[in-house]
């Protein structure tokens, strides 16, 4: 698995956990700390790279204070629920 594939896999896992945390409701703020804990990501910089990727894809928005809290978009919920 190359680095890009690894990033996509981790981003999908983060998205799936965030969808579960938000109970599938768009616009619901989720916590970076809870998502990091549930996905076993301990490196803040790694999480921030993943969050930026998800933001660029239009799956999350409204990241506050380095994505300490963020919301899922309709597209993000649909993508996270696909798998």
PLM features: residue spans?
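Short acidic, hydrophobic short linear motifs in intrinsically disordered regions
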Residues: 24-38
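A short, conserved structural fragment
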Residues: 55-65
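Minor-groove-contacting beta-hairpin "wing" of winged helix-turn-helix DNA-binding domains
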Residues: 67-72
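Short alpha-helical segments that sit at the start of domains
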Residues: 1-26
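Short, amphipathic alpha-helical interaction segments positioned at domain boundaries
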Residues: 74-83
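Short amphipathic alpha-helical interaction segments
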Residues: 41-56
């Amino acid at each position: 698995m190359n680095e890009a594939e690894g990033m996509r896999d981790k981003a999908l896992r983060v998205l799936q956990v965030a969808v579960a945390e938000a109970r599938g409701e768009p616009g619901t703020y989720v916590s970076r700390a809870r998502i990091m804990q549930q996905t076993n990501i301990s490196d803040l910089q790694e999480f921030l790279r993943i969050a930026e990727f998800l933001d660029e894809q239009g799956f999350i928005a409204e990241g506050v204070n380095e994505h300490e809290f963020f919301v899922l978009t309709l597209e993000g919920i649909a993508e996270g629920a696909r798998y």
